[in-house]
Amino acid sequence: MAPAAASGGSSLPSGFSVFTTFPDLLFIFEFIFGGLVWILIASSLVPIPLVQGWVMFVSVFCFMATTALLVLYIIGAHGGENSWVTLDAAYHCIAALFYLSASVLEALATIGMQEGYTYKQYHENISAVVFSYVATLLYVVHAVFSLIRWKSS
């Protein structure tokens, strides 16, 4: 544990070093794929409105929270406090669980699309499912490495 602490691996980056450290580099990809999920769900038709509502909530919530955390890390609002490492790990674990549930529900709703939907609408939903699973993977990887950082802090 001492080498990680000595090299700064157990603290959060600030400034533009956020874009050069792993797992914080994943913020960019979470932002991109989360935005794509948000756009695709907003423009697609889902046979079960409750599912679309949950997927929209998850994508908008995670998009906004990821953006807020990214901006706060860039401006250095954490000040090197260990509580921010805990917040980072907790947020990414919750976001990973939320996105996993949203991805599964969106996939289930897309599979259930049969009659009354065009080929284009079906493909929009398939794209939303794929990007949702990519976002889930990104959040899971970020959560795992955030938990490792939290444990070493």
Curated annotation (Swiss-Prot):
The keyword Cell membrane does not apply. InterPro entries: MAL (IPR013295), Marvel (IPR008253), MARVEL-CKLF_proteins (IPR050578). Residues 47-53, 115-125 are extracellular. Coiled coil: none annotated. It is a multi-pass membrane protein. One of its GO terms (biological process) is myelination. It comes from the Eukaryota. The keyword Membrane applies. Keywords: Lipoprotein, Membrane, Transmembrane, Transmembrane helix. Lipoprotein. One of its GO terms (molecular function) is structural constituent of myelin sheath. One of its GO terms (cellular component) is membrane raft. Residues 1-24, 76-92, 148-153 are cytoplasmic. PROSITE patterns: MARVEL (PS51225). Residues 18-151 form the MARVEL domain. The chain crosses the membrane at residues 25-46, 54-75, 93-114, 126-147. Belongs to the MAL family. Could be an important component in vesicular trafficking cycling between the Golgi complex and the apical plasma membrane. Could be involved in myelin biogenesis and/or myelin function. This is Myelin and lymphocyte protein. The lineage of its organism: Eukaryota, Metazoa, Chordata, Craniata, Vertebrata.
